[in-house]
Amino acid sequence: MTSSQDKTLPFQETLRWSKITSLRTGKGEVLVCRPKTSDDLAALLQAQGAGQIPPLCPLGAGTNMLGYDDNQPLAMVRLAADGQFAAVEQLGNGLFRIGAAALLGRTLEKLASDGYGGCAGLSGIPGTVGGALAMNAGANGQEIAEAVRSLEGLDLATGQPWAWQVGQGGWGYRQSPVPRQVLLTSAVLEFQAVSPQEEEGRIRQEWQRRQRITPRGASAGSVFRNPPENSAGRLLEQTGCKGLQSGVYCVSQQHANWIVNETYGEGQAEDCLILLREMQRRVQESCGILLQPEWRRPC
């Protein structure tokens, strides 16, 4: 696939999957669109409806996504970090409307400096607010779902608005009510009034903790969800998964639930899948538990 086959929009380009995933995986190409405004999104939907670009698919920062080794007939939509979808608006009473393209860690830092917090435990999670919401990201016993009051987005398959309000449910461990084809555009989150100095200190401590425990190399974070009342990392370590390698990827010696690319170069998605399947096989054969991936594949 080349961009010459598609309607040319000023905010689109053709990239290799390895350029849009934090794991740097996937040698195939895909169309990537970075709309800044609602008008840009409308232009994308119009082009899709006319068959001038491939089907649209949401893309956050690519921090928990596995790419493809072949070209895919998709147009990945990554909201621009310098457009209207990264704005933060104070609504009063601790409520803020936050654009889905805003980076989660930076947003929490800015809110802390303004005297709002309560989510410091999530501040070390990489990626965008939209991506964190789509998977209900969590850390330190917290989940982002706890702060959500409403969501707004766009169903890329139908072109229709999509919305969620508190009380409608749909949240769970690494699970949200957001359908796979919905591109989140904003969310209303509720924060507590806090001491800026104390909240900034908590965020600083979380960043320091992350730096200590995060394995070296390009990665997409934890490979598998924790099974009920158990730890995926512990099961993987018990079954000898540390050090397994395929291509440029290996299971980290520091944390058995991480696959890392210590070369930081481009790798094949198939090598990641080889490791993922072997990790699953070992745990299932030894412990009778089929680990469920935390990573996603587009659409």
What are these regions (language model features)?
Residues 27, 61-63, 102, 125-132, ...:
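Gly/Ser/Thr-rich helix-start
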Residues 52, 59-61, 147, 217-218, ...:
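Short, basic and Ser/Thr-rich N-terminal targeting/leader segments
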Residues 26-27, 31-38, 66-85, 134-167, ...:
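Structural signature of FAD isoalloxazine-binding scaffolds in flavoprotein oxidoreductases
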Residues 11-13, 19, 65, 154-274, ...:
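Phosphate/pyrophosphate- and phosphate-bearing ligand-binding catalytic cores of soluble enzymes
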Residues 2-129:
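Anion-binding (especially nucleotide phosphate/pyrophosphate-binding) glycine-rich loop
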Residues 61, 105, 135-138, 167-171:
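Short acidic (Asp/Glu) patches
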Residues 102-109, 137-138, 176-179:
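N-terminal short leaders/motifs
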